[in-house]
Amino acid sequence: LKPVAIVNATSFSGRGVDGTSPLDATNAPVFQVALSTARVKDWKGAERGLSPADLAMHVVLPEVDGRLFAGIVSAKEPAKKDQDLEYARFEHTPIVDRIDRVVSRVDKWIALQNTSAPKTALILSTYPGKAYQIAHAVGLDAIQSCRAIVEDAGLGDPDALGDLGQRLQTEVLTWSVADYTAALDTVPSDLHAQLFEAWGDIAQDQYVQNGAFQFPALQLGNALIALQPERGWLKTRYDDYHDLSRTPCHGYVAFYLWLQSMNTDAMVHIGAHGTLEWLPGKSVALSNACWPDALAGDIPIIYPFIVNDPGEAAQAKRRISALTLGHIPPPLAQSHTPDAFVPLENLLDEFSNADGLDPKRRDRLMDQIRDLAQSLGVEQDLGIAGDVDQGEALTRIDRFVCDIKEAQFADGLHVFGRMGYEGDQSLAAHSERDGLRTALCGRRIASGP
């Protein structure tokens, strides 16, 4: 057999003691579906989507195997009562529209295998909304990573991007309100009602000018590069970002319907993290009445994500069926004692030497340390009251100075698929580049960070 894709409905992990799985033998991508043990009506009304047991069996453990979660396909309903047994057993009942979503989602991934030049949307975050932090991503230089992805995936000439950050603040691509209104017919009626109840007239949307939506975006070859629109108003951005209850505005909804209307082959969200996976809806096993499902549609989503944030990466995997590609964090630099704290550190060292050997000198040093710590504001920062025990105060001051001296911090930002600092990172850089190319070809990627 040479399948182009595998849809797996078995639960738990599919790996043996040697770490291999028969599902991986053909090197085809494996899509995991969930069979809920709840009744259909209970699933429809459940905010969590799946029970803890179903989540573990059908999502979490297959996720560790590297399966792409494609959605829920069935829940349970009582069968016809057996009159002899006086018992009606529960049977799995297909959820037809969710099966259709799984099929279309898998079809789009398969289509990538036969597309030499996929139309790819590269999406950059706008959080936290300051001009100097455009395209923010945790630990990732998203602007330079965008250039690298354009080059590595053969989407266009990265040099033609010029000053990408500046261009994204000045250039726009448009979509008419008329086309948007027509596309809204594809949005489930419940979501349609929520949208207009929350945001009213389309013409009043912040992204609408002269009868069209103005998206911060530009086209380069097969790549569409865009800033992810605001979920709501800029002034409420911080509150909106992780809010699972706020309905997105017309401009946000229009952006993703626009991508669907252009038959986008793949979407690459560059870096942790965006807002699509945080829209209202179920936590997992989404229905068609969940905003992430309606806006992501069946477009394959590839998501370079920092490896040390698996919790938020799981949100993208489970709510928008994203394939996350782990990237290494920036290198760590060693901190040092600030100049203003050097005299305090010296006094603490002297105190350690005098303690137990010269009580009079020790007491003088103790007073000097307290006085200096107070003048530097250290005691205030640590909440040390004036009447606190001297020994406790010195212990806390010493621990504070040591923590500062021994701390490590991120030095710069990582560029996806590149080695931008000293050290042998060639394996990680190669893995990132290869993972991106493989994903855009619709092929299987082995599990890993």
Predicted regions and their residues:
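Ligand/cofactor-recognition surfaces for anionic moieties
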Residues: 1-449
